[in-house]
Amino acid sequence: MKKAKILSGVLLLCFSSPLISQAATLDVRGGYRSGSHAYETRLKVSEGWQNGWWASMESNTWNTIHDNKKENAALNDVQVEVNYAIKLDDQWTVRPGMLTHFSSNGTRYGPYVKLSWDATKDLNFGIRYRYDWKAYRQQDLSGDMSRDNVHRWDGYVTYHINSDFTFAWQTTLYSKQNDYRYANHKKWATENAFVLQYHMTPDITPYIEYDYLDRQGVYNGRDNLSENSYRIGVSFKL
């Protein structure tokens, strides 16, 4: 309930205050995970400023995942992200930032730094390192109460095909710091996301996304299942 109130407050500010949000973006996305047989809905509001600051807030809702099978719909998590762009020259940019994730288990902090390179006016490459630190403890494989902290590396490729279409690829490697395992029975896991955007109007951009999430699917007491994510969404400039 508190997370819902926080999200409502931020959305109200974004929609009602022109001084705070003059060109915000609202992103609505739905998806399905084939291994876990789970449906998701995401609502995200983001804003960038000319002075280099960027911020977003989003909520994620699942129907059956993360031991939440008794409810048809529930607000599983809310996260807030802030970063600042430092232009090194006309092609290179460094973005230090922080992601704060709220869930029923507790709060997770993810400080990161991202380096991006505009190879051409249509082609961009990026790489990011993020450290996910949990402010709460959970039982590890040895039975001890520890923090399930994670090292995360991301790679990005974005290509503007033409005035109508943009293609993006994000590859991710996760590595658990302590005595925990992913659903693939390993301390590490990978993800690959492929997105195709259609710039229907200057203010409306629908898109489709396919993700391969390694063998991280969990369903009916079984894990190590091949996990595919199929998503469709649309972004609106407000």
UniProtKB/Swiss-Prot annotation:
Provide the alphabetized UniProt keywords: Cell outer membrane, Ion transport, Membrane, Porin, Signal, Sugar transport, Transmembrane, Transmembrane beta strand, Transport
Single GO cellular component annotation?
pore complex
Periplasmic membrane side: 24-25, 50-52, 87-91, 118-122, 160-164, 201-203, 237-238
Membrane topology per the entry is: Multi-pass membrane protein
Q: Which residues lie on this side of the membrane: Extracellular?
A: 33-39, 62-76, 103-107, 133-151, 174-190, 213-228
Q: Record's superkingdom?
A: Bacteria
What is the residue range of the signal peptide feature? 1-23
For this chain's UniProt record, which GO biological process terms are given?
monoatomic ion transport; oligosaccharide transport; sialic acid transport
**Which Pfam families does UniProt cross-reference here?**
KdgM
Annotated compartments: Cell outer membrane
Q: How does it assemble?
A: Monomer.
Per the record, the similarity remark reads:
Belongs to the oligogalacturonate-specific porin KdgM (TC 1.B.35) family. NanC subfamily.
What the protein does comes down to: Outer membrane channel protein allowing the entry of N-acetylneuraminic acid (Neu5Ac, the most abundant sialic acid on host cell surfaces) into the bacteria. NanC proteins form high-conductance channels which are open at low membrane potentials and which have a weak anion selectivity.
UniProt name for this protein: N-acetylneuraminic acid outer membrane channel protein NanC
The organism named in the record is Escherichia coli (strain K12)
